[in-house]
């Protein structure tokens, strides 16, 4: 009887620990949110389509729809915001995007968008460069010096 009780107690502890781990892991995941594609207020670009943005961020184009040079900025390879952006833009997971860029760079075809260390650094650089395009996970305030040209809806 004591062995059965001890076994039941052990199972409860293991299940409790597993449940706690699952809950904490879910809490650590980034919330599903829209991604706001931004350019500086000084930019001539007023809006973009998802296809136009896809071409910029996948290296197929280096110009905005109006023909002006575009300089896309990105977050670091493992940033949760980067994963949310590419998932919303392409429907692909970050590992697939990283693999795509590794192949293109190895073959010498093109270079990926320039990574910046943080979203705040991206905001500052985009504000100062009329050719820049970037993305943020929260809609920027009107006084931030940025214009939202596309909102990518979260796919999950």
Where are these regions (language model features)?
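A broadly tuned "polar low-complexity/structure-edge" signature
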Residues: 2-3, 34
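Twin-arginine (Tat) signal peptide motif
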Residues: 3-17
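Short alpha-helical segments used as structural interaction elements across diverse proteins
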Residues: 8-10, 29, 79
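Bacterial N-terminal signal peptides
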Residues: 16-26
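Sec/Tat signal peptide C-region and signal peptidase I cleavage site
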Residues: 27-33
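Flexible loop/hinge segments at secondary-structure junctions
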Residues: 33-156
């Amino acid at each position: 009887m004591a062995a059965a009780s001890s076994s039941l107690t052990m199972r409860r502890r293991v299940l409790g620990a597993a449940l706690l781990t699952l809950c904490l892991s879910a809490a650590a995941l980034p919330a599903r949110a829209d991604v706001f594609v931004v350019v500086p207020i000084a930019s001539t670009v007023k809006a973009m389509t998802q296809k136009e943005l896809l071409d910029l961020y996948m290296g197929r184009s280096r110009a905005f729809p109006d023909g002006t040079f575009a300089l896309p900025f990105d977050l670091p390879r493992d940033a949760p915001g980067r994963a949310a952006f590419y998932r919303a833009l392409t429907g692909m997971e970050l590992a697939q995007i990283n693999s795509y860029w590794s192949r293109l760079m190895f073959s010498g075809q093109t270079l990926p968008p320039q990574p910046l260390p943080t979203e705040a650094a991206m905001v500052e650089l985009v504000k100062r460069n009329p050719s820049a395009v970037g993305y943020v996970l929260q809609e920027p305030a009107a006084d931030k010096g940025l214009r939202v040209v596309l909102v990518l809806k979260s796919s999950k």
